[in-house]
């Protein structure tokens, strides 16, 4: 995998990683609320 360094960094404890590991069940059973004021 050739992912951006930020994704690789949060996916591994050690530095220098170039892959991203994602758990398929991550986020399961959660709710998200998005509030947008429309002002920018």
From Swiss-Prot:
What region holds the Peptidase S8 domain?
4-40
Description of activity control: Strongly inhibited by antipain and PMSF. Inhibited by benzamidine and aprotinin by 80% and 17% respectively.
The active site annotation covers: 36
Q: Which keywords label this protein?
A: Hydrolase, Protease, Prothrombin activator, Serine protease
Question: Tell me, which GO biological process terms does this entry list?
Answer: proteolysis
Single annotated GO MF: peptidase activator activity
Q: How does activity depend on pH?
A: Optimum pH is 8.0. Retains over 50% of its activity after treatment for 20 minutes between pH 7.0 and 11.0. Inactivated by treatment at pH 13.0 and at pH values less than 5.0.
Name the domain of life.
Eukaryota
The top EC class, named as a word, is hydrolase
- Reported EC number(s) for this entry are 3.4.21.-
Q: Which InterPro entries match?
A: Peptidase_S8/S53_dom_sf
State how activity varies with temperature.
Optimum temperature is 55 degrees Celsius. Stable from 25 to 40 degrees Celsius. Activity is reduced considerably by incubation above 40 degrees Celsius for 20 min.
Family of the protein in this entry: Belongs to the peptidase S8 family.
The protein's role, per its UniProt record? Subtilisin-like serine protease. Cleaves prothrombin at 155-Arg-|-Ser-156, 45-Thr-|-Ala-46 and 316-Tyr-|-Ile-317 to produce meizothrombin(desF1)-like molecules. Degrades fibrinogen. Inhibits plasma coagulation.
Assembly, in brief, is:
Homodimer.
Q: What is the protein named?
A: Subtilisin-like serine protease AS-E1
Provenance organism: Acremonium sp
């Amino acid at each position: 995998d050739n992912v951006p360094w930020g994704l690789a960094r949060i996916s591994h404890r050690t530095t220098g990683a170039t892959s991203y590991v994602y758990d398929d069940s991550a986020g399961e059973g959660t709710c998200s609320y998005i509030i947008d004021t429309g002002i920018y």
